[in-house]
Amino acid sequence: MTFHKTFGYGCIVLICFELLFAGVETSSENDDEYLTQKEIILEKSYHGLIRENETLVEITPLIKVNEEKICNFHILKKPYHEIPFKIELVNNLGILKARRTLNCENRKSYHFEICAIYCDGTPSNTANVHITVIDVNEYAPTFLEPSYVIEVDEGRLYNEILRVEASDKDCTPLFGDVCKYEILNNDEPFSIDNEGSIKNTEPLSHKASHNHILSVVAYDCAMKESAPIMVSIKVRRVCETKFVGMPERIDYTSGSTESLQLFPNARLDLCDISCKNEEDLRIHSSIALKTKHISFGCDRDISNCTSGQKVKDLLPHGAEWTKELSYDEGLEPIFHFDGSTGVVVPATVIDHYDFSSQPFSILTLFRHNSQVEINKHVKEHIVCSADDHKMNRHHMALFVRNCRLIFLLRKNFNEGDLNIFSPAEWRWKIPEVCDNEWHHYVLNVEDSSKVDLFIDGVRFENSIENRHSNPEVIDDWPLHAAHGVNTSLAIGACYQSLENRLKHGFNGDISEVKVSLNSVLTAEDIKCGTTCAEHLLAPKPLQSNNEKSYSDNSQIKENIEMNEIYISAKNKHDIEQFMRKVQYINTKQKPTVGRRNIEVLTTLNCKNESSLRLPPIETYIMVNEPIAPLGIDIDVVSASLETSDLTPPSYSPKIAISGTSNKLVSYQEIKLGVHILEKTCIDSVSKNNGKLEEKNHIDSCSVVVFPSLNPDHEDIKIDGDESLSSSMDIKTNINKDGVEMIGKDTISNYINVLRSLVYSNKKPAYYLNRVFKLSCAQQSSQYKSGEYTLTLTVLHPKQTLFKSTNVLPSSLSKVNFIGNTDNETSFHRNSGSVNGNDNNQPTESKVYSYSLLHTNNVQEPKSHIHSFIHKAEGSHVTMLIILVSVFLAVLLCGVSIARLKNNQKYIEHHQPCPKISDDGLIWDDSALTITINPMQADVTSDASSESENSESEDEEALKDGFTHINQLEWDNSNIFQQ
């Protein structure tokens, strides 16, 4: 029994345990399911961005929860780490905010964990949060130094003068790195790169500026600009060994001085340069005058060259056979040849001269236009003597072919010499022919065995290695006999008689071609023609009592052309004295105006040491126009040279322009046209060998109008036949600025054209006067006269009274003119405007002149009428009563005056007028009484209208003489007419 009880209790306990374990197991499964639902509330990680100046964090992805289950969030803090954030639950979203504004420069990112809190207080699973602080460009770059100061040497180019550096406190490369530097004042010769390195772009000069102050800024990569800082770059003066006191420009005026010192204030600054032994110092200087661009390489004056030989000019300027050539007018005429032009010299100059039998010389000055592609077979003749008909044989010629100067001389037929070879062609291979420069060539031909060539005054000498080939001499047979065939001499080409045309033309410019017949030019003649009139004068060594002669320690040399001087001295004092005495001179009477460059080179050397080359000095001489005296007459220099002989220089001629300086014209005259220069005279006289000689030719004249013409109503034309100047050698060009006349012709022809110029103006009221300036020139426009000025004054008519229908009697008009004859004649004599060829002009001019001399103080009726109307309108009614009361008295007076007036008119028309003196024209209104009927309104309006009409017809009234005098007589008869 006891066993059964015990067993029963054991079963009950066992069952209870089973039930207990079963309940525990069920509860554990429910708890795991609940926890699993909590873990999916948050993501494993979140990433956030926050700007420095904001507090809201942008979270990706969004923290989404269910507010029915989640009531809060919690940030899990770690020890020793500050988490400046908070999280709030708003509308099922977790909003993460910063407790304060963050600073990227202090900390760029934050890492922490968050969890959601269920409403029952149970926490959810945790999630990692990574927040990055976004930088804001809140800081500008700042330089490490507040300013920079540095000193540099002048005259140097530095790769880097100094380096400036700036930094930025922002934390990201975009805002925190400096990407650019800039110099704000761009006018300074400096540059800066992106690394802050400053260098100069040109050598600095202490004289120009001893301190350069730069304003420099820096930019970060977002181009935020820093505050500027000052960079001071001081220029340290460096002593440079060189000549100082050398002028940049030297003015030279012909006729002012015979010679001109170039460097009167020259001083050599040696700085600290010295030799161990002072006697070992040597200073070398060279002064070069560069005139290649002037005229033919320099100014040449052959006016003083004298020669016993008869020189024929085959290319004279102004000759009949050279008129068709294209040329430049100037001191030395230059003829242009293009390969298709040339001229034949008339037989009257050289009559079929046999060049093979007599000695002769050819002198020429030309510039050959060499081409890139040279045809080796093309001949370009300077001078050529060939058959005049039947054949094309060349007897004598000077031509260029394949950059060689070739001279041809064929012997004529002589019995016994037909089969004998003799030199016939000389070929010089010289660079001067094809260098496009001017060169002077002289050929002296004494016989067929001796031909000498001179280039720029220097005799051509062949070198040893090519003495047999330069010149290359070609032998040939004499020409065959040809009866009745003469020669034609051509310049710039060669005459081909079978084709009857010029051929083998020259390409280039030729200034002169001359020949000396029966004799050759001497060395003195050649040198005189090629010597430059302008050159440098070397200083002369001087001897003092206390010092050694300069020649002991110094050397002075100059070249043959006298355009270079070499000076060598042993000390600073000597070289300075020599440089100060170097002079320039130009002996040509009329030097070429322009610039001549001067170059000075200096070197220093000590014995057994390397030499030091000083900076070259570039300056120039400016040759100016000769100084001319003021006034109309001007002295000019004669630079003409006779074509047949070398004549001595002549004295300067004078061009004198004379005439009236003022001309008065009326409206009617200027509308029809006036001869502006009808009283002009031109004279040109020169003094030669103490005798006065008249120069009958001038080259150009110009008439300048001031102000310029208005083509709408002004005009200048040639009176009568517009082709007047075309029959002469004068070309006339008329434009709004005046008249230009060009062409060499006689003075009388120029005067005829000038006097025929007619100026007209359809609207003369626009101008009070006109100014015409006349100037003329001689000798290819080299010498100009002074300006002759003529002032043309327009006489404006005086405002006339209202027009009257009465005409002035002719007898009264005649008396007025006769009475004023003396005054008018003297007035016109002074003004110089009398024209004896026009009988109507003096009469008309007197009327205008008289109105200018005698001004009458008479008010116009229009003003009187307005004045009276104003008073009448302002009168009281009582004025009408007073006027009516006196009406009878006025009526009686009016009738009496009317009868007297009619009687006076009858007497004036039937009796001669007495002579009217000048004072009679002065209006005396002391006894005049004017009464106007205020009721006669229409009379007033008619008079006013008539006065206005008279203003528009003032010119017609003036034409009628003194017709306005009758208007001064008061006629009150119409007052009583109703």
Curated annotation (Swiss-Prot):
List S-S links within the chain.
none
Report the glycosylation sites: 53, 304, 486, 608, 823
* Pfam families the record matches: CLSTN_C
Q: Which UniProt keywords apply?
A: Calcium, Cell adhesion, Cell membrane, Glycoprotein, Membrane, Postsynaptic cell membrane, Repeat, Signal, Synapse, Transmembrane, Transmembrane helix
Keyword presence, Transmembrane: yes
Q: Which residues are exposed on the Extracellular face of the membrane? A: 27-876
Q: InterPro entries from the xrefs? A: Cadherin-like_dom, Cadherin-like_sf, CLSTN_C, ConA-like_dom_sf
Mapped to this chain, the residue ranges on the Cytoplasmic side of the membrane are: 898-978
Q: Which SUPFAM superfamilies match?
A: Cadherin-like, Concanavalin A-like lectins/glucanases
- The UniProt record lists the Cadherin domain at 37-143, 144-249
Regions crossing the membrane: 877-897
Entry's Gene Ontology BP terms = calcium-dependent cell-cell adhesion via plasma membrane cell adhesion molecules; cell-cell adhesion mediated by cadherin; homophilic cell adhesion via plasma membrane adhesion molecules; positive regulation of synapse assembly; positive regulation of synaptic transmission
One GO cellular component, as annotated: plasma membrane
Query: Which region ranges are annotated with the description Disordered?
Result: 937-958
Q: How does it sit in the membrane?
A: Single-pass type I membrane protein
Signal sequence segment? 1-26
Tagged with keyword Cytoplasm = no
Indicate where this protein resides in the cell: Postsynaptic cell membrane
Coiled-coil spans are: none
**What function does the entry list?**
Postsynaptic adhesion molecule that binds to presynaptic neurexins to mediate both excitatory and inhibitory synapse formation. Promotes synapse development by acting as a cell adhesion molecule at the postsynaptic membrane, which associates with neurexin-alpha at the presynaptic membrane.
Supply the PANTHER family for this chain.
CALSYNTENIN, CALSYNTENIN-1
Return the protein name.
Calsyntenin-1
**Coding gene?**
Cals
